[in-house]
Amino acid sequence: MKQFLNVSDIGDLKQALQEARQVKQTPFAWQHLGKNKTIILVFFNSSLRTRLSSQKAAMNLGMNAIVLNINGESWKLETEMGVVMDGDKSEHLREAIPVIGSYCDMIGVRSFAKFEDRDFDYNENIIRQFIEYSGKPVISLESATVHPCQAFADLITIDEYKKKDRPKVVLSWAPHPKALPQAVPNSFAQWMNAADADFVITCPEGYDLAPEFAGSAKVERDQMKAFEGADFIYAKNWASYEHYGQILSKDMSWTVGARQMAVTDNAYFMHCLPVRRNMIVTDEVIDSPQSLVIPEAANRVVSAQVVMKRMLEGLCL
């Protein structure tokens, strides 16, 4: 595996889930693969679960992990080509990336959407430069449009808790005071479609995801109707794709609470975290026995470790 951005990079999902079960049962069984190997985790944006789970996954595999927080610990980096660097950016990615690559065996990169230019964000210009110029395997730790480590962890969690072969999974938009990227819902939709779940997206008008990510998912404007008979509810805010980066609604009736959960088939509640309580979801729901947010977060170590393990195995070939 040379890169991990999309569900296609992981290959057969049944095999990936089986590998995840093995990793979860015996997390230290592959430490020989990571001996004398180093991963550098590059963060352009804040992180809690992604940073810690990636470091833990690397340690489980016997690797050294170096974390670089770009905006607080290094030179400010220019990301666009062809610019005159007469501002506050001291170094260009074109030089920084191969330097970083020379210090490690694989790289993880977190770089959120800027919401300034949809084409720039959806072309994944920053992480694509890491893939092109580093000469090393690259993992998306959430880029402008995708968060594959999160989506893989979500799939692992659903696989662990599902009570039927093809559960009904609902991705529900929920209100938030800030404009949030589409990376998490994009990846969740992409992975649920690939897993052939009974998958429904419910969101207000103007919040449809990009077609390449929504795929064949049914889109339902009526949240209550979408929730009927659901086995898993995944709540998440995202800004508009059509009116790029804009907040079109803060309708609190979309907050996931007991009223909505009552029409499900005793569904589990999921969220990637961090979550705005009583905006995205009520205390009653997130603190209930049906809430999976903590085991879901714990599976971030498992998903990251499967990906890193495969990359290490590729280095040994």
Predicted regions and their residues:
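Rossmann-like adenosine-cofactor binding region
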Residues: 212-291
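Positively charged, low-complexity intrinsically disordered leader regions
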Residues: 1-52, 56
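Phosphate/diphosphate ligand-binding glycine-rich loop within oxidoreductases
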Residues: 34-40, 47-159, 276
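C-terminal helix-to-coil terminal segments
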Residues: 287-317
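Glycine-rich phosphate/diphosphate-binding loop of Rossmann-like nucleotide-binding domains
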Residues: 44-66, 159-235
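Phosphate-coordination loops involved in phosphoryl transfer and adenosine-cofactor binding
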Residues: 33-39, 166-168, 266
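A short helix->loop->beta-strand "cap" motif at the edges of active sites that frequently abuts
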Residues: 134-136, 197, 262-268
